[in-house]
Amino acid sequence: MTEYRKPTPAEIEALTAAGNSAENWDAIEVAQNFTPAQLSGCRLEGRVQIGRGARLRRCTIRNYRIGEEALIEGVTALECRRESSFGNGVRVAAINENGGRTVRIYDRLTAQTAYILAVYRYRPEAVEAIERMIERYAAERRDTLGTVGPHARITGARFIREVNIGKGATIDGASLLENGTVCAGAYVGIDVQARDFIAAEGARIDGGTLLERCFAGECCTLDKH
């Protein structure tokens, strides 16, 4: 487990000289082997943890944990403004769009579980038991800090708010991501806008796709073109 420390006065001086600033340097934590060269032209607000080897360039970050070897470059705002479950527990209309058969999404949802929740309405006890489990899971995921996983890459994006980003995930040029989870290995591309969503492992969302209250399943591709 990574051990964190406060940046030293000499490191803060070097960071400031490289165009970085912080709302409160006392709220910033860095890995033991941190070097100021990891940051350039960044604004840090609230509480920020910076993992080993993470590189931050020309971005604003608020209330996030940045995993080791992650890259964040050219991001207008990566921020967690409030406590969030990061898309876990959101109700999504299934089968019809009138909301009569909603499914609570979460980042471990399977097709089998979703089918039971949407179709087995004649088994209310089973459905209620699964929904209670999902509610507990969503409560466990609640946090005031967002997470960028190890080796994740976020480049050229605009606004990312209350979104957890998994190990090795890539976000390249997304316009707006809000209240969601991008799981390990998933890809979110140019001009994508998504709210209240989960992108499962290996999912690919690209081409200006618009998502709202949606679960993009494992290795699924969503593209306007």
Model feature map: region roles:
Residues M1-H225:
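Domain-scale signature associated with acetyltransferase and cell-envelope carbohydrate enzymes
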